[in-house]
A protein has these predicted regions:
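Short amphipathic alpha-helices and their capping/turn segments at secondary-structure boundaries
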Residues: 2-4, 203-208
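A conserved catalytic-core segment of Leloir-type glycosyltransferases
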Residues: 8, 45-177
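Extreme N-terminal starter segment of soluble prokaryotic enzymes
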Residues: 9-13
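A short, glycine/small-residue-rich beta-strand->loop->alpha-helix junction that serves as a flexible
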Residues: 19-30
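Short amphipathic alpha-helix
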Residues: 28-39
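Short, well-ordered alpha-helical microsegments
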Residues: 32, 197-201
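A generic structural motif
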Residues: 39-45
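Short N-terminal targeting/anchoring amphipathic segment
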Residues: 182-197, 208
Length: 210
């Protein structure tokens, strides 16, 4: 029987780890292990992001004693866990407008401050109860129209079917990350040891917790 993962009510430092420590050895995992062990005076919370649980075997590293909290989330299992009935829905107009504003800001090359202000608004609304919910992304008319517009304006090579499913696969996990950000225990510092989805999770935490 495997040992239960440690859980805590709070920690000093949260490390956001994507496809690395403690399930993968070498490289980034080695220095993560070294960092944690170098600071025994700090309590660490580890958030591991992986593809699917079946892609990982046992831990390759024993968790140091100062890891007081460990949680793991699998990005592509959200497709299997999402049991939403497809149904016609217009979509939330405020949520659609926020996404369009953020996309337009990136296209215009707005200043970092302007784009981050819009990202802050989007991040807040992706949390449970916000106006940007997974159901609308998957099934709403507004989301469909946005994908169609982007494809017409910017995609000349891949088929629309490829574009549509790639968009779903890439973006659907963001709502899982919103739930992770909402539920993470209080910490004093967050460090993203990986970019990609872990970096996005770090951005969500920065913009939803301050």
């Amino acid at each position: 029987m495997s040992t239960p993962h440690p859980k805590a009510q709070m920690a000093d430092i949260a490390l956001l780890l994507e496809g690395t420590f403690p399930y993968v050895s070498g490289g980034v995992s080695s220095w993560i292990n070294q960092i944690i062990r170098a600071y025994p005076q700090y309590r660490f919370a580890l958030v591991f992001l992986g593809s699917r649980r079946s892609d990982y075997a046992e831990f390759r590293y024993a968790l140091p004693d100062n890891v007081v909290h460990f949680e793991e989330h699998y990005l592509y299992e959200i497709f299997e866990q999402t049991h939403l009935e497809p149904a016609a829905r217009p979509g939330n107009p405020r949520g659609a407008a926020l996404v369009q504003e953020l996309i337009d800001s990136f296209r215009r090359g707005d200043s970092r401050a302007q784009s981050m202000e819009l990202f802050h608004a989007v991040a807040q609304q992706m949390l449970p109860g916000g106006c940007l919910q997974l159901e609308d992304f998957l099934y709403s008319e507004r989301a469909w129209n946005l994908l169609c517009d982007i494809y017409r304006e910017h995609c000349a090579d891949p088929s629309f079917v490829d574009f549509f499913w790639t968009s779903r696969i890439m973006y659907q996990p963001l709502w899982l990350l919103a739930r992770v950000a909402h539920g993470l225990i209080p910490v004093r510092v967050v460090h993203c040891a990986s970019t990609g989805y872990a970096g996005f999770l770090g951005g969500l935490l920065a913009h939803t917790r301050g």
